[in-house]
Regions:
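Solvent-exposed serine/threonine-rich low-complexity stretches and specific carbohydrate-binding patches
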Residues: 89-101
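Surface-exposed, short loops/turns at beta-strand junctions within beta-sandwich domains
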Residues: 107-115
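Preference for solvent-exposed, low-hydrophobicity sequence contexts
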Residues: 154-200
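Extended, polar beta-sheet/loop recognition surfaces of beta-rich domains
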Residues: 15-35, 46, 54-57, 74-75, ...
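Gram-negative bacterial Sec-dependent N-terminal signal peptides
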Residues: 1-15
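Contiguous beta-strand segments within globular domains
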Residues: 60-77
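Short strand-edge motifs at loop-to-beta-strand transitions and within beta-strands
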Residues: 103-105
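Solvent-exposed loop/turn segments flanking beta-strands in beta-repeat/beta-sandwich domains
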Residues: 76-85
Length: 200
């Protein structure tokens, strides 16, 4: 069973609402062109409609630290589809899966600050077929330090469950995603990969 986590892991230090606005001031052009959203997916097409959700604080900002772990929740798909992830100057294509899962990536080096996008690579395309999940990686305002510490610790706990299954309801509640419960099965397999060094 998934180890107990607070029902709301952000209750320790709730991120203040102005956080995203502060991030926008630090890099106004890029974040204005690319608004943050933790969930991706469309409403049409078997592939494009697949749910993709980042495990990041509710404000969409994540400082992954010196040993980055990135987490993505994938919904069910009628066809096996690879998962595309890209950030700063790097891009990864994870193996195709059909069923819903929790994917975790342990990276070999710190990630350069910038946007992180994830989406299903439909028919081998490397451009999003629908709005992607989009978060901002890198150090944020000092007020977000506690939330990022909780996020990193929770990702490490999840990494310790690689190859097992986790309770979906508990996972979603911990990451403020309870509204997605009806789109996912009761448990999710934890699929872990350690990409080879490349780019960021």
């Amino acid at each position: 069973m998934f180890p107990p986590l607070p029902l709301d892991i952000w209750s320790i230090a709730p991120p203040p609402l102005p956080l995203v606005a502060q991030a926008n001031r630090s890099s106004p052009d890029r974040t204005r062109r690319f608004p943050l959203r933790r969930e991706g997916g469309g409403t049409r097409g078997a592939c494009a409609a697949r749910l993709v959700a980042h495990l990041v604080p509710p404000d969409g900002l994540l400082d992954p630290g010196p040993q980055p772990i990135l987490g993505v929740i994938e919904g069910d798909s009628p066809v096996a589809v690879p998962l595309a992830l890209r950030w700063s100057d790097d891009e990864r294509i994870e193996p195709a899966r059909r069923g819903a899962s929790l994917r975790l990536l342990l990276l070999s080096a710190p990630i350069s600050a910038g946007l992180w996008e994830s989406f299903p690579a439909c028919e081998g395309n490397t451009e999003p077929p629908a709005p992607p999940a989009r978060s901002l990686l890198g150090p944020g305002p000092r007020s977000s330090a506690a939330a990022n510490g909780v996020a990193r610790n929770s990702l490490r706990v999840l990494w310790s469950r690689c190859g097992e299954r986790v309770a979906t309801a508990e996972l979603l509640a911990a990451w403020d995603y309870s509204h997605l419960a009806d789109r996912l099965p009761p448990t999710l397999p934890v699929v872990c990969t350690t990409p080879s060094p490349s780019g960021g």
